[in-house]
A protein has these predicted regions:
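Hydrophobic alpha-helical transmembrane segments
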Residues: 1-171, 175, 183-318
Length: 318
């Protein structure tokens, strides 16, 4: 428990350092290196899938073993040394401060009426085209990103830490990074990235639904509409193209009385994603801040729940 709380506090105070030695940056470099080595456009679909699966296995093994080795050697440190090493590594696997900082920055620009710069900033955190987005569309994109990334950027790493300590949290982050880099359904990655995408879907199965429940409790604690959040999650979560992505987004949409989803543009091509929630309010800057509050509340609730469950089970905490 000390490790998880310390990791959260390290992130809250320091945030993610912008360094080429950041573990997730190193994972990205390894993935890019292996992609260059394994991907061949002329390969058959079956071979592309096999080579992509090999990339996944290698990245997972290296990431897990590196974290396990660091934790093994940290046990020789005096006092709280091992817990602090674990907390530092775990803090690199979660990103509440980065999400909050990005959201607050976009919110501030919208309040100033600076749509041009807000479009630029939101373009850093979403994959869609942003050059023609309205204020409501910028706010929608930001809320969707914060909600979805609460799963893979906070709750899921902490969930896998609870199960298997720091090495398993690192393994999850490696899997999620592979999905974000090669898990696309386009011509290049449809087969090569399929193993990465399927693995990410499987790993997020429980954390995504857990995040939805945490958001409902958070909505109740913060005075938002928890009942509507539950109803919208049950009604709309399965409409998301991802098997997991809809739970956090639908719950936030219900709690804040907004509608997410709709028309997005990718590389100049419009794509419609099913609506989630009801447009009781027009999505705006205040909903970004409310979503950030829900994100932090859900994180604290998870840490409290983590403590209670492990105490009841009689296990020592990581």
């Amino acid at each position: 428990m000390l490790t998880a709380i310390s990791a959260f506090l390290i992130d809250a105070i320091i945030g993610d350092p912008n360094s080429k030695w950041h573990p997730v940056v190193l994972m990205g470099k390894l993935i890019s290196f292996l992609e260059r080595a394994f991907y061949r456009p002329e390969d058959s679909d079956g071979k592309k899938f096999a080579m992509g699966a090999m990339l996944v296995i290698i990245v997972l093994l290296i990431s897990y073993d590196a974290a396990a080795a660091l934790m093994h050697f940290s046990y020789y440190l005096p006092g709280w040394g091992s817990a602090m090493v674990g907390a530092l590594i775990l803090s690199f696997m979660i990103s509440p401060k980065s999400l909050a900082k990005a959201g607050k920055g976009i919110c501030a620009l919208l309040l100033l009426g600076n749509l041009e710069e807000a479009r630029q900033k939101v373009g850093w955190i979403v994959g869609r085209d942003t050059d023609k987005l309205s204020e409501a569309e910028i706010a929608r994109a930001t809320v969707e990103t914060i909600a979805e990334n609460t799963v893979d950027g906070i709750i899921a790493p902490l969930f896998f830490f609870a199960i298997g300590g720091v090495p398993l949290a690192v393994l999850y982050r490696a899997a999620n990074t592979m999905d974000s880099m090669i898990g696309y359904k386009n011509e290049k990655y449809l087969y090569f990235g399929r193993a990465a995408a399927r693995l990410d879907d499987a790993l997020n199965l429980i954390p995504a639904r857990l995040t939805g429940l945490l958001f409902i409790v958070s909505a109740w604690l913060l005075g938002f509409d928890a009942r509507h959040a539950l109803n919208i999650m049950k009604r709309d979560a399965d409409k998301h193209p991802s098997p997991n992505g809809g739970y956090a987004e639908a719950t936030v949409a219900g709690a804040l009385h907004i509608r997410l989803g709709g028309v997005n543009s990718y590389f100049g091509r419009e794509s419609f994603r099913a609506y989630m929630g009801d447009p009781i309010q027009v999505t705006g800057p205040k909903h970004i801040m409310e979503c950030i509050r829900m994100m932090y509340t859900a994180t604290v609730l998870y840490l409290i729940g983590f403590y209670i469950v492990f105490q009841c089970l009689g296990h020592s905490l990581y």
